[in-house]
């Protein structure tokens, strides 16, 4: 089946066996559900498959194996095959290259940013937000509130799912991406209240969708005494337990001052 190797690669990575290779493969340049149909190549590794195919910095990557490239998720998924057909544009003309390489090997192209676009920021205002509690005067990057499912897959970040769409979730399922989810509570009304986001409760359905599709989700609960503990915590744990073995949960207790 076409792209079976790519799918196999994603399964290997999602099971945690990609390790060092995953970092080397993905660190250069994932998934917004947006149809960005091309991306500029900013560099090419020496002696790489792309270099051998005479792909150059300044070329525009159009497609891989007939698939338009929206971001690095597409890039790594479709480039995993041992036979890779790459279409680039140079000086207004499209140029097709057929590249033979070891299965899963990176093509060796570099892009303008880690994600090929902007990070998705957090749209919540959680009552216990750790970033809001950080002291001033630290490096600026520490104050950025990311909520990007791509970084969850690549770096292990936790995401709330509140800025994802059904299309995003289907793509996660199709590509077999195991991600980490900040749950906090499975009570929709309480989740909206804790996260100050009116969509937070509805997005809980994505957890069930992903778990029932066979993905493994690492979940966390920031337990705030008097708010989502007691009966609410028992409800949350019971709901998550019903999705075992596809749910792995961690319990983190926040200090009381966090939400006063």
Annotate each language-model stretch with its function.
Residues 37-45:
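PDZ/PDZ-like groove recognition
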Residues 50-70:
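Conserved PDZ fold ligand-binding element
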């Amino acid at each position: 089946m076409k792209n079976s190797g790519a799918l196999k690669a994603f399964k290997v990575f999602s099971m945690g066996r990609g390790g060092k290779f995953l970092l080397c493969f993905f660190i250069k340049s994932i998934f917004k559900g947006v149809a960005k149909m091309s991306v500029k190549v900013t560099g090419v590794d020496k002696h790489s498959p792309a270099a051998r195919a005479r792909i150059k910095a300044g070329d525009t990557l159009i497609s891989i194996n007939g698939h338009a490239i929206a971001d690095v998720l597409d890039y790594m998924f479709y480039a995993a095959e041992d036979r890779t057909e790459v279409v680039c544009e140079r000086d207004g003309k499209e140029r097709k290259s057929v590249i033979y390489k070891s299965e899963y090997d990176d093509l060796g192209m570099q892009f303008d940013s880690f994600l090929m676009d902007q990070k998705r920021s957090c749209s919540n205002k959680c009552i216990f937000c750790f970033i809001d509690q950080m002291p001033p005067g630290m490096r600026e990057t520490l104050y950025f509130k990311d909520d990007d499912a791509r970084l969850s897959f690549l770096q292990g970040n936790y995401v709330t799912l509140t800025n994802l769409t059904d299309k995003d979730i289907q793509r996660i399922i199709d590509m077999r991406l195991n991600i980490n989810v900040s749950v906090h509570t499975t009570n929709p009304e309480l989740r909206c209240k804790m996260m100050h986001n009116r969509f937070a409760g509805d997005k809980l359905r994505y957890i069930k969708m992903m778990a029932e599709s066979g993905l493994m989700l690492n979940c966390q609960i920031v337990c705030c005494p008097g708010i989502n503990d007691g009966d609410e915590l028992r409800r949350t744990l019971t709901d998550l337990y019903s999705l075992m073995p596809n749910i792995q949960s961690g319990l983190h207790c926040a200090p009381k001052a966090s939400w006063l």
